A protein has these predicted regions:
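Conserved structural motif at the start of ABC-family nucleotide-binding domains
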Residues: 6-8, 21
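The feature captures the beta-strand-to-loop junction immediately N-terminal to the Walker
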Residues: 37-39
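ABC ATPase NBD coupling module
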Residues: 56, 69-93, 129-136
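Catalytic Walker B motif of ABC-type/P-loop ATPase nucleotide-binding domains
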Residues: 183-187
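Conserved catalytic motifs of ABC-family nucleotide-binding domains
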Residues: 179
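Conserved ABC ATPase "signature" region
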Residues: 119-154, 202-206
């Protein structure tokens, strides 16, 4: 097997008698943007759902090649793929928590790390220094990304009150809080005006070049 960041081999997804993905193979490299192009209903979102554990493919394999190990994504559930393989995603329709603040949305992405630091115990949350330290670190990381997209001054506002383009960017940087090796974006520019699309392109170039994340 070669050492691409992502290797997909003969991926097939069937729903009863309907074949949504038929024997798809491709690879994606670190520090590059790889696009899956096709008309509505071609199965693009289904590919992402397989990669991120929402669906278990009928056939085929998906490998995430990290520097120290190769991970077979098919073996893991969705949250384990995010936690262990460091694969993150956004959705075709924005999936923020609109009634929570912008900052709270960023902290939700770091829930797994905070729970590990707590020892999965209410006593850990209340008393453990490591939990408090991790919480401070999580807020710092969240504010770093909010500064990148120019939303520091909106940190306490409800995410649902942001303009559409800012919500798109917020969803992307929320995903970046897990420090992913691979970031899957499902039609990230859908509904954006030219100015918002330009800002999105700059953000993705920064993620690709500065964070060395495959997109």
């Amino acid at each position: 097997m070669n050492k691409n960041l992502l290797t997909v081999e003969n991926l097939t997804m069937k729903f009863g008698g309907l074949t949504a993905i038929d024997n798809l193979s491709f690879s994606a490299n670190k520090n590059e943007i790889t696009s899956i192009i096709g008309p509505n209903g071609a199965g693009k979102t289904t590919v992402f759902n397989c990669l991120t554990g929402f669906y278990k493919p009928t056939y085929g394999e998906m490998f995430l090649n990290k520097s120290d190990e190769t991970i077979a994504l098919k073996k893991f559930t969705d949250f384990k793929i995010a936690q262990k393989a460091k694969v993150a995603r956004t959705f075709q329709n924005i999936r923020l928590f609109p009634a929570m603040s912008v900052l709270e949305n960023m902290l939700v992405a770091q829930h797994n790390e905070l729970m590990i630091a707590s020892g999965y115990s209410i006593f850990g949350i209340l008393n453990l220094k490591r939990y408090k330290d991790k919480e401070i670190e999580a807020v710092k990381k969240a504010k770093y990304w909010l500064d990148i997209i120019g939303l520091t001054n909106r940190a306490d506002d409800n995410a649902g009150d942001l303009p559409y383009g800012d919500q798109r960017k917020l969803e992307i940087v929320r995903a970046m809080c897990i420090e992913p090796k691979l970031l899957c974006l499902d039609e990230p520019a859908a509904g954006l005006n030219p100015k918002e699309s330009s800002e999105l392109n700059k953000l993705l170039e920064f993620i690709k070049n500065d964070k060395k994340t495959g997109i």
